[in-house]
Amino acid sequence: MAKTILIPTDFTVESLNLAKTALENNSNTTEKLRIILVYGQWTSSSITELLFYSKGQILEVLENEEFKCSCKMLLAKYESIIDQMSIDIFSGTNQNAFENYLEGNKVTEAYIPRNYKLKLKNRNSFNLIPFFTKSKTQLFEVNWNTVSLENSENQKNEISSLFFTHGQIAH
């Protein structure tokens, strides 16, 4: 049976540092990993909007090319230990809903950033970190330095920097 790891995301390459850390921490295990990247967004209360609600369409709007490319790179680099990597939206309103989400997805551990504030994409988005910190799931806080980007060349380098370790390319 695969271990399931829950990781909050804001659909930036930077937020994938949590996934990279989780994968590195579990790289010596023979157990396969299920990675769930989750984003907090409330659903509308409009009957019309709920009738035509599509999680796929919402994710399509939230994801960008750099994020998709970085996810593919993570999958390729850690294919030997990743059983499945998915992106989901949590739209619950309280801690009980979050605990039910964890139980329903059989989440065994979670990773959150210590010194990085997730960026909310729209007015319906909300910060999931308080739900994580109050949960009963084993929680790992990841500390990393963020770098401000000044131009698009730096943004491209940010993707490749996910896979550099101490000045050398990680294999």
State where each predicted segment sits:
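Hydrophobic/aromatic ligand-binding patch that stacks against planar heteroaromatic rings
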Residues: 25-27, 101, 131
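Short amphipathic alpha-helical segments
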Residues: 19-20, 123-125
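Small/aliphatic-rich secondary-structure junction motif
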Residues: 2-53, 165-171
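General small-molecule cofactor/ligand-binding pocket signal
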Residues: 36-38, 86-90, 137-145
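Intrinsically disordered or low-complexity boundary/linker segments at protein termini
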Residues: 1-17, 129-171
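Charged, low-complexity cytosolic intrinsically disordered regulatory segments
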Residues: 43-110, 115-121, 128-129, 149-171
